Amino acid sequence: LKRWLVVCLFVFSWLLESPASGEVRIPPLGGEFAEERIIAIALFNETSVNRENVLEKYPSLRVRKVFSHALNGISIEGRRKDVEQLKKDSRIASVTESTLYQADIDNSVPFIGGDAIRGLFNKKNERLTGRGVKVGIIDTGIDYQHRDLRRSYKGGYDIVDHDSDPMETKGKNKTLHGTHVAGIIAANGKLRGVAPEAEIYAYRALGPGGSGTTEKVLQAIEMAIKDKVDVLNLSLGNSVNGPDLPISLALDRAVALGITCVASNGNSGPDMWTVGSPGTSSRAISVGASTPPAKKPYITTGLGGGRKSIPIYPISGSKPWLANYSGRLIDGDIGLPGQLKKAKNKIVLVKRGRISFAEKIANAAKAGASAVLIYNNTKGSFYGKVEEKGEIPAATLSGEEGEQLKKTKPFYIHTVMKAEKELIADFSSRGPVTSNWMIKPDIVAPGVGINSTIPSGYLSLNGTSMAAPHISGACALLKQAHPEWTPEQVKSALMTTGIQLKNKQNQQYHTYEQGAGRVQLQQAVKADTFFYPSSLTFRNDHKKKTLSASIIVENTGIAAKHYRFTQPGHQPGIVWKMPFSFTLQAKEKKKLTIELSHDTRKRKTSIYDGRLTILEGTKKIHLPYLYAINEPQYPRVMGFEFVPGDSKSNYRYELYLPGGAEEMGIALYEKESYRFAGFLDWSANAPRGLIRKEIRKEKLPPNGAYIAIIYAKKAGREDRIERTILIDLNK
């Protein structure tokens, strides 16, 4: 049910841009939300705090869970006003409302060097396959009975059902995500994962439909720490871009305890600032998705000078879209049975929405169609998937191309396969992280068209959820080859040997799009120079003209090495002060400072990025960097959605505050008269991140269309979003 509701966020929400009608004055608030009960995570300043004494003043608050490994804190439940008061207690470091997390190889394993590295041996003369390395997976569970996973699975726990059986959800709201992730890491049968002999420990923190709470994910991290896993994979996340959320902090702690943590960067790209927690963790390895070079299908229409090629994206799990496929195209509206009466032996063009992809494909097949093209109901392209293979091929295309096809009504379309180079996937979330401007992702790996294990067999899926386990498998191989390596050394080896990718215009992607580039495992295993950190952020907190960043360089080789930083290319208004060349003896390390001076009069924007080059003899090593001259102008409020709630006649909303707000509110105005109708919600000192609430029907205005003014105030600045929402309590 939870997954269905999350999906419905985009299916049933009726949100339209509404033209501004002059300045709207928001009336003062009458307090009415303080009694709402919420769940939150409270972190303590000191380890010796008496938890019972802290909560004595707040009788409505009760302890739900105690965290002592991943975090020093508790999860609590109680009235919002008491939780707000608790934030002021000197013994409390932070209080964060619990949010929802969503579970967001055949050719990809050799592509990243997985096959090549199996030809190498460790000091025990063992082939590099991940043998003896414990990999934890926090996800929807695992089908440990799958023939390709039986040998790899060693144990785990079901946090959702509180037992030692982390099997995937079956029946209604069934899941497959965790099994797919596990196969990429360590399948050992018909398919072979990156590290086929690694030991898999599965922690089921995401329940039916593939969603779970902060609390359950934290419990899973605690268990993984207790089980002393070597590598921990989290192919999950939410849309909260902040470095200090509980899950991100817990991963930082796990890394400090010696666990190499890997997190997916999110599937909300291609815009900046779309990375979500736990991909925002400072010390974990955050992974974006690339599309390996391949021949990809395009449909062509027209003749001569009017000929046009349109990229299409085969739907994962559907019957393959074959090369040189052609046929007559007809408009099938949204794909309902009554709209497909002329579909026999035709390719049907249908619009996304109202019914599922599987239903559209099944309806077209029943009507005798030869294939289905589903175009987006908003701008841009998208990737789709179905869990049951249909009878006919199906693919997606962008909203713009779909509308154009519908308008021009071409008689025939033809399919051609075009070779495309390796690119960053459009859906892959971009950084940087708000607040600290850290570069994310750290690295990218294949995440498009990844075939792996699922409970019913095998399925090809897309997502950074598929990219992250490539890196987790790579970490397992590196740990087997070099068991003495720390998580920081594993991260450095992967990042300093990554290959930098270029876009279709042959320009290098920004560092906040690709991090250090795409992983090259066969190079990473040979690394013996390490950099801490492996990317640099220069932040101007006090409007200084000179910014600095520190870095430690370590030579773990058996001989002395000479290093030299090269000067970056000319940048107007920027002067770099690089360290002098230096030599490190074997097993020696050195701390360095890099400075840059800037003239704001010659700089047009607030964020700049690039790569520093270090020469180790004749070998080039690249370090991503980013500097912020002023606080970037990211939106103070974003991501507003308004949808039906969990209970009948209730509604729920969500919005995102990148930096928190001194005041946040949602004011409603009648659409026709623009008369003030009341506040949908209001909050003082709202925390940074995602806010999601259900509004009871008695708190809602009468049925009708309303203009919603969503605003956030902070440090004398106010940002607003204006949307039209529809309330219908009769549904």
What is the role of each PLM region?
Residues 274-276, 280-441, 455:
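Structured lumen-facing ectodomains of secretory-pathway proteins
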Residues 136, 263, 423-429, 518-557, ...:
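Beta-sheet-dominated interaction scaffolds and their linkers
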Residues 162-240, 288-293, 336, 346-357:
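Subtilisin-like peptidase catalytic core
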Residues 117-165, 180, 184, 235, ...:
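Acidic-leg catalytic submotif of subtilisin-like serine proteases
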Residues 21-34, 63-66, 77-85, 103-137, ...:
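N-terminal domain-start motif of subtilase-like serine proteases
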Residues 117, 125, 138-148, 172, ...:
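Flexible, small-residue-rich helix->loop connector segments that border functional cores
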Residues 182-185, 194, 201, 205-207, ...:
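Hydrolase catalytic cores
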Residues 4-33, 48-124, 401-411:
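Autoinhibitory propeptides
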